[in-house]
Amino acid sequence: MSELEFEIERRRTFAIISHPDAGKTTLTEKLLLFGGAIQLAGSVKGRKATRHATSDWMEMEKQRGISVTTSVMQFQHRDRIFNLLDTPGHEDFSEDTYRTLTAVDSALMVIDSAKGVEERTIKLMEVCRLRDTPILTFINKLDREGREPVELLDEVERVLNIQCAPITWPIGMGKRFKGVYHLYEDAIHLFSASHGDRIVKGEVVEGLNSPKLDELLGDIADELRMEIELVRGASHEFDPDAYRAGRQTPVFFGSAINNFGILELLDAFAEYAPPPQARQARERLVAPGEDKFSGFVFKIQANMDPAHRDRIAFLRVCSGRYTKGVRLFHVRSGKAMQVANAITFQADSRENVEEAYPGDIIGLHNHGTIQVGDTFTQGENLKFEGIPSFAPELFRRVVLKDPLRSKALQRGLQQLSEEGATQLFKPLRNNDLILGAVGVLQFDVTAFRLKAEYNVDCVYEAVPVTTARWVSCSDPKKLEEFKRKVHDNLAEDGSGYLVYLATSRVNLSLTEERWPEIRFSATREL
């Protein structure tokens, strides 16, 4: 096995998906704690405390206690290197999450034991389905009263259309929560709630029939034996191949806030989650073990370090090896560039990276030349597929309070829209700046960041736009005629692509009927 193959086999690149408040950010913290990446876990809801969750690093996230950008964190466990992409928990940020899910090889789904499968989880599972992403499930908050485990598994199977294979099984819940039984190790891990910030090895009883279990649990021990017999008979057996094909999800139970059930989850992840897989480019399939480097940009983050006003392009390595100072070919621009200062992440702390392998996420300093969806190679013309941009559903005109700050506003909006949470449109008929977003929170975030990072005060005004469509046509003459006739409804997006801004759904339908040669697209492949 070559060094490259060895390093690929060690990598596990994954994202955590959940409905807001299912405990995703807490679980992220605890995975890092167990992986040795952070010494003290910062509780997410302690907003006024000095300690904050490592992954919620941006100022607004610290104030509101929700994740609104994707963080990248690397940690090690059992000689495996985990790259964890923490995704926004708030539903307004679906586009950022969607793109992040194109950069992972598997996902960890977190479900609140009291609430079961929720709307956001269903949407994210649909996204994972498009690429048959393997899913591992953690049912959280067993230290609180919740629904029956059998009922939860049944709901996951029915609503998400995926087989469940329980690996651990809870013993009681809420005040009666005693721990979990590991079905494949025949061991009972007893619950201890006293170690929120420290890793304490809890007591483990080997064997379901151990007399020690009767000593510790009394009558509950016999109830557990009967329950486990029923569970074994009624549930699916874990099949690693079905899991890797995205047809089955292994299920773990625990309490992230109490560090309980995390180790079993991590051990299974290290053993069964897939290493970096081959990636489809327009030209061919790219295998991770190829000698030549390739990778794609799935996210751009402005002002990760407000002191430096920088923009970082997050790049997923797909093949070969990155080494410091390597010359890379930026396919879209056709230019070569030397990359000497790529960085690796731990939420907002960063360090220069000497080398990186397939599955790793590296940050490239971006001076406005790199866009989401860009491919980097060592000379080959490749374009990785499957990174979409969606037509926004909400629109606002941006109005500057101080006209002298107009350049700073334009720069700020351009840089923030490059991240992809909002989109910037410049109408052809005037100098307006129109922002489009998937949800209202994105407008709040943009205004907050314009003030905090660019010292620009702005307000929003309503604008008569209901939806947007990217327009294209194979006949240049027809396109020119279209541009003349509907000039007042046309704008350019932040990348210079032509967009039709519809005043209503009816307006869009009529325009599509009148111009059958023009293609109107609700998504644009980046």
Curated annotation (Swiss-Prot):
Per the record, the GO terms for biological process are: regulation of translational termination
Location of this chain's protein in the cell: Cytoplasm
UniProt keyword annotations, A-Z? Cytoplasm, GTP-binding, Nucleotide-binding, Protein biosynthesis
Q: What is this protein called?
A: Peptide chain release factor 3
Every copy of the tr-type G domain together lies at 9-277
One Pfam family in the UniProt entry: RF3_C
Q: Does the keyword Protein biosynthesis apply?
A: yes
Q: What does this protein do?
A: Increases the formation of ribosomal termination complexes and stimulates activities of RF-1 and RF-2. It binds guanine nucleotides and has strong preference for UGA stop codons. It may interact directly with the ribosome. The stimulation of RF-1 and RF-2 is significantly reduced by GTP and GDP, but not by GMP.
Family membership noted in the UniProt record = Belongs to the TRAFAC class translation factor GTPase superfamily. Classic translation factor GTPase family. PrfC subfamily.
Under CDD domains, the record lists: RF3, RF3_II, RF3_III
Q: Which Gene Ontology molecular-function terms are recorded?
A: GTP binding; GTPase activity; guanosine tetraphosphate binding; translation release factor activity, codon nonspecific; translation release factor activity, codon specific
SUPFAM superfamilies attached to this UniProt entry? EF-G C-terminal domain-like, P-loop containing nucleoside triphosphate hydrolases, Translation proteins
Residues given in the record as GTP binding sites: 18-25, 86-90, 140-143
- Give the record's GO CC terms: cytosol
Q: Which organism is it from?
A: Methylococcus capsulatus (strain ATCC 33009 / NCIMB 11132 / Bath)
Grouped into one coarse class, the protein's main location is cytoplasm
Q: Is DNA damage found in the keyword set?
A: no
